[in-house]
């Protein structure tokens, strides 16, 4: 299979040195993204095209390659093509007929040809010759250049002919690694996950910082969605996940700060801590999911007061987004279900939160705060690469694993719905229920408490994590299914 990758349009208008740097980075990223699927993958090209060639014939692996490329920043679109040496017009006609002939009977069609290089003919001459030949030989109803039912597309580059089989949309943006790096304040909800996606899509390597307000389930959920975002949109790069224990900070705010300023103070403490993390990691900006006036702390006066606490640039990609648009985007990118089932810990709730915070007033309230508490939180912060968070969480968990299903036991497939659809779990004589990992914690209580449940995932890590959490919640009827 050969793919022709067309770069994001904004890359092509850059100066030659910048364009070459961006395209080299994109080629490097494509190799990194697809390396585990085909170690012999070839990626070559220049200007606005990259040619990706693989000898893999497994249809499932090819589908996975295409899916990964659609989620790789820097790609405008890409084409599945059949490559041939360039022959004469009759040869071009024969190649197009071989691929499109059975689609044209009784259909209106058009022929599109793009060329690069010097040739003794024009693109229009190719289109006319091939179009008339296909109409004559394939029983087509006619030619319609405006709204054809079938498009016969090809590209001619120097002495090569590419007959286009299918076009796939890309993510756009710039290649990860070509721009600066940022730190995303991640809560795992709709806003922060979409904000992270927007930055990654634009081409910025996005690291994550999570402020734990007092819940292991919340931390686990945020780790899972951060891992999902990295795996789907940023796997070409090394990304960090930093977790900062903020329980004592919340307690200090609750006991020392006036009710109306609790929310603003908490946000300022988070920005203080995030700035310190960003400085240590040498990151260029902070990213939050705030939108104007979505909640009381996000009015312009409040945001202005919050930002004064740091000299680090704070980016808010969703600042003028409507909530429904954010939810729709989350659904589109696959984070909506994570957000919908994310445990929430609202430790700082103001009965009458201010929407017009004053700098002098917030400084007065913060003067009561013991900053040693914030320092301790930063000292206790943990850091790991995001590709390892799931594995690390799964270590040393005491959960019973079984290799065989006993009569009456139910296997729960907790894999992502895409994996469930691609490779359904079928066990003869065994009841299998599908309940994705992001919903298992909130929906397990709906199941019959008198039945025994075995959680299943591909590697056994996610199932072990969630079984451990359910056992800690008091559910004694859960085990992990690990077939031999």
Swiss-Prot record:
GO molecular function term, any single one: tRNA binding
EC code(s) of this entry = 2.8.1.4
Q: Where do the annotations place ATP binding? A: 185-186, 267, 289, 298
Its keywords, alphabetically, are: ATP-binding, Cytoplasm, Disulfide bond, Nucleotide-binding, Redox-active center, RNA-binding, Thiamine biosynthesis, Transferase, tRNA-binding
Which pathway does this chain act in? Cofactor biosynthesis; thiamine diphosphate biosynthesis
Predominant location of this chain? cytoplasm
* Start and end residues of each Rhodanese domain: 405-483
Cystine links in this protein are 346-457
The name on file for this protein is tRNA sulfurtransferase
The record's top EC class is transferase
The record's annotation in CDD domains points to:
PPase_ThiI, THUMP_ThiI
Which family is it part of? Belongs to the ThiI family.
Q: Which residues form the active site?
A: 457
Q: Which residues form the THUMP domain?
A: 63-167
